[in-house]
Structures are given as C-alpha cells and as structure tokens.
Amino acid sequence: MNTDLTTEQKDYATFLPALSGFYATFIGKQRREEYVDKSRIPYPSMESMNWLNKKEGLFNYHWSLYSAGHAELDINKDAPKEDMIRDRDRNNSWMLGDSGGFQIGKGVWEGDWKDPNCPKAQKKREQVLAWMDAYMDYGMILDI
C-alpha cells in the first residue's frame, strides 16, 4: 500500500519536511549493506520508509528540505549515507537545499565568515554551491 500524501494534501500550504542526516543515513546505507538488522524493520525493507521513493515507499511525498549542514559536500566522493538524496527520482520528488547557515552561526564550519576573502569560508561556499547544483532542485543561498 502506497499513500500519496502529495495528492491528499493538495488543498493545504506546501509543507517541506526537513530530512535529517540520520534519517537519510538509515535509508542510504541500508541500500548497500545490512546497516539496520532486518529483524528491526517492520515492513519488507528500510526503503519502505523513503517517502521520496514513489514505487517502494509506504507513502510518497513530493516535497522535502535538506540542509548542506548535514550533507557530504564533496560531490565526487561516494557517500552511501547520501543515497536517499543523491539517487532519488527527480521526476517524482523536489528538494529544497538550505545553505547551512546554522553551522556557520554555531562555529561548526571553520572560517571567518565576515571576511569575503577568507580561504576556508570560500572553499565551503564553493562546496555548498556545487552540492546544490548537483543534487537540489532549488537552493536558498542566504547566509554563506
């Protein structure tokens, strides 16, 4: 049974559930290895919890948000934990990319963000933009 929440919720404002890195990791890594013991998965597979997978998910929802602050920003690196985002069917899903300003504000991302010439901050800016270009349908570049 697959419930299409996009159709069922069409008369309401569009809600973008924020996909956490932990959630994406469970979906992505399970595609390549037994990351979660199968006895702990109540339905045929972990993929049934992937709302971006219209064919195998228990429910489907077209819209989501994902933050660069949770992402593997090296787009040339194989990252199984990112499979839910990187290998999604882009014809049946839409992802808004957040630029990761919270990580800047909390000091998680190194660099002098007030200095437009800081090499560390500039490298991160370039990574975020490349990541958004590669995997997001729309990006909010507000604070990097």
Regions of interest found by a model, annotated:
Residues 1-144:
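Non-catalytic, usually N-terminal nucleic-acid engagement modules in DNA/RNA processing proteins
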